[in-house]
């Protein structure tokens, strides 16, 4: 099964994995999240290129012998899809010699229609407007509170956005790590599992924590999960 969901991909992938595990014949799901954004962003795009990275993650999700309750929310709104998209390459505008032509924007960035376009202000405003109330709603539905969450592991476009999200949610910044872009770059749907592996490492092989996971981006799509993660068989970063 191949799901194209960009920066919300890990959350969407986990939701799909949980639904698959509801089937009696399925006991284990291997979830692969990978993106090679460096091939989608123009090298002459000073707005996006410095933040981009490539990564692939593997998450093995197994059926539990004990009842497990996981709360999740997923939302989509296509009215602002052009805030974060690759204009060409689909049926509406197939890739061609014309779409490969580089065009300079008002800020001096050069992109073709085959390159990723990220309207930073619009994406930032969307995240600050939509994500905090989604998290508040998720916690309300789960009968939980912000204080009972140990870690807020969110998709990481940049440190500034994560700091503003933490402040708006009223949670300590140290509970919402924001150091992935500076170490690995923004690798789209792979940033959340990279975040977990890099910041918690083998601690998750010995301990269990309450996590709030959130992804947001292309679509525009945003989603969140509230769940326990811990006592893992492995949790490591492999550099290449």
State the predicted function of each range.
Residues 1-3, 44-46, 118, 122, ...:
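A short glycine/serine-rich beta->alpha loop
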Residues 9-12, 37-41, 78-81:
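Short, well-ordered, mixed-charge alpha-helical segments that flank or form enzyme active sites
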